[in-house]
Amino acid sequence: PHRYKATRNGLTGVDFSSKFSPWLASGALSARTAYAHLKAFEAERGASDGSYWLWFELLWRDYFRFLHLKYGRQLYRAAGLGKQPAPSHDPAAFGRWCRGETGEPLVDAAMRELAATGFMSNRLRQLVASYLINDLGGDWRAGAAWFEAQLIDYDVYSNQGNWLYIAGRGTDPRG
């Protein structure tokens, strides 16, 4: 936990993530248990920026759950919580994005990593989502559905919440 803040935005490697997400997503680890262990760690070794950021990420996870309780099906509309028109969708461009054949080396490497491993760092998830939405003009819902089909740590609440945020169609319209 002490190093988490310094490594949390890494793109690849073994140290860029807590590796909790597959366990949390499958229900094999509860957020409550993770939090209890985090507090025990802090009691023994002291709090740090890293342990704070782990706690903060657990809060984001809960925040996305509360969004679903409040807004329900609205979160799945093309406009999300906003009033924007439905995004365009170019099936050919979306297919290239899914296969990692966009011509953008970092985006392509990230998408091929996802296909090969079922995992991608949080920072790369944000990057490829932004690329689909802002550079390709793609439909954020198609990207969210692709992540649902590919991620080993898929969590409906976090996935939908993050895609809405990046698309500027959630509670923060800036995206």
Question: Where do the language-model regions lie?
Answer:
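Catalytic cores of enzymes that engage adenine nucleotides and/or redox cofactors via long glycine-rich
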Residues: 1-117, 146-153, 157-174
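Short glycine/threonine-rich loop-to-helix capping motif typified by GTGT followed
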Residues: 134-143
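Extended, compositionally biased non-globular segments
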Residues: 116, 131-134
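Conserved helix-adjacent loop modules within structured domains
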Residues: 117-119, 140
